[in-house]
């Protein structure tokens, strides 16, 4: 590989020496950095149109953050819970080419001390909190608490949340969770973080309002593998460590990593929040009875526990020889973490300061004809999976028209 690297570099230097500037040795049309959803879709579509593509990923596996690993018959979401949902039929049909989806519906449960509440806030939640039975009673209760607080112009997140849902819901279900998520007290957080809190006056625990929802039977990794079938992929290959070879290997780069890192943090670091996961296999058949349980009190250090087997149900799940159910389950505790270089960036911090910093990088990128940035980190924006697909297809259309 080193020889190959030297020969290529040697050829390039030799041509420069002969001053044959019109000849460029380009082995690929596109180098795609990152094999997550954005990178894989671009690779798949470009390959279909006859383009020569190389995908590199610093991880030892494809899939980016939607990577799932089968452990003892259970598909484990390695980088946090991923539930696909969309109201866009075109996008739903697109993703269904690559896997069959089950009818999983996201209905998380929030645990505050030993009390359990349905999320998002709905009539089941209000009945458990106050014993109210009708939507009218629930509305009156919330309005009464909002009026008692008397907050006209919220100065921070705490005041904003209380002005939206009252003190009881805030204290039990919002405060601790949010403080853990952001690593700051709610009184120190800006009010704009919570623009609204979804409140439903119906008995419905479905978290999303979208028409289509589910999880691919057999996990997400197969989707990416099918997209990248027949395409050259190099794993455990860090773009920055192999930059000299990689940056002159293709006509154009599709970069799905952090835009600030690509430009050497020229204007300074963008801020992110990171996560830390602790996964364990337990000798019980069913640990918590739900895929996702949020822990809303501040004293519990993790924000949620995921029990992976509940994302997919059915005869094949966790079965062992003889058709018996495996007396095992796999859980993951999710801890929010301060991001520093070297840690995985999961959430972008789209406040005023970071938005303005990103616009400087975006300006640089717009003038750079060699590279296109895509995905959460490339575009410095929180995208749900369906929005990533929309962005990737839009990018392909623009690029290959």
Task: Report the location of each language-model feature.
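Extreme N-terminal leader/targeting segments of oxidoreductases
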Residues: 4-30, 48-49
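N-terminal Rossmann-like FAD-binding beta1-loop-alpha1 element of flavoenzymes
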Residues: 30-55
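Dinucleotide-binding Rossmann-like beta1-alpha1 core, especially the glycine-rich loop
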Residues: 72-147
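Glycine-rich FAD pyrophosphate-binding loop
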Residues: 47-71
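C-terminal catalytic lobe of FAD-dependent flavoproteins
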Residues: 344-401
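Mid-domain catalytic core of redox enzymes
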Residues: 12, 49, 239-364
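Active-site/ligand-binding neighborhood in enzyme catalytic cores
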Residues: 113-117, 123-252, 256, 261-263
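Short, well-ordered alpha-helix to beta-strand connector turns
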Residues: 28, 50, 231, 249-251, ...
């Amino acid at each position: 590989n080193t020889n190959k690297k030297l020969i290529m570099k040697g050829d390039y230097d030799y041509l420069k020496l002969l001053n044959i500037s019109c000849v460029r040795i380009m082995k690929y049309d596109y180098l795609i950095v990152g094999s997550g959803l954005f990178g894989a879709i671009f690779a798949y579509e470009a390959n279909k149109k006859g383009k020569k593509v190389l995908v590199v990923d610093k991880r030892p596996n494809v899939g980016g953050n939607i990577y799932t690993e089968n452990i003892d018959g259970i598909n484990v979401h390695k980088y946090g819970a991923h539930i696909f949902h969309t109201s866009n039929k075109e996008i739903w049909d697109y993703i269904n080419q690559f896997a069959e989806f089950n009818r999983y519906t996201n209905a998380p449960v929030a645990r505050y001390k030993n009390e359990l509440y349905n999320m998002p806030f709905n009539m089941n939640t209000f009945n458990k909190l106050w014993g109210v039975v009708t939507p009218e009673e629930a509305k009156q209760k919330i309005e009464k608490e909002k009026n008692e607080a008397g907050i006209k112009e919220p100065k921070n997140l705490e005041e904003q949340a209380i002005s939206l849902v009252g003190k009881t819901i805030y204290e039990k279900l919002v405060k601790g969770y949010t403080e853990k998520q952001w690593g700051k007290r709610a009184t120190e957080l800006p009010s704009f973080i919570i623009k609204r809190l979804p409140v439903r006056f119906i008995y419905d625990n479905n978290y999303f309002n979208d028409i289509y929802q589910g999880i691919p039977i057999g996990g997400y990794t197969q989707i990416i593998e099918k997209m990248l079938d027949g395409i050259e992929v190099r794993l455990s290959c860090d773009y920055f460590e192999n930059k000299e070879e990689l940056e002159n290997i293709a006509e154009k780069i599709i970069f799905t990593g952090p835009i600030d890192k690509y430009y050497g943090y020229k204007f300074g670091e963008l801020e992110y929040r990171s996560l830390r996961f602790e996964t364990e296999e337990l000798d019980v058949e069913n640990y918590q009875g739900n895929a996702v349980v949020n822990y809303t009190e501040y004293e519990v250090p993790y924000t949620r526990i995921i029990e992976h087997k509940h994302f997919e149900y059915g005869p094949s799940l966790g079965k062992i020889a003889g058709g018996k159910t495996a007396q095992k389950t796999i859980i993951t505790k999710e801890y929010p973490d301060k991001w520093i270089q070297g840690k995985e960036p999961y959430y972008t911090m789209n406040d005023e300061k970071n938005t303005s910093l990103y616009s400087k990088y975006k300006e640089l990128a717009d003038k750079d004809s060699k590279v296109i940035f895509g995905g959460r980190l490339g575009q410095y924006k929180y995208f749900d999976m369906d929005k990533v697909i929309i962005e990737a297809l839009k990018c392909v259309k623009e690029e290959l028209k």
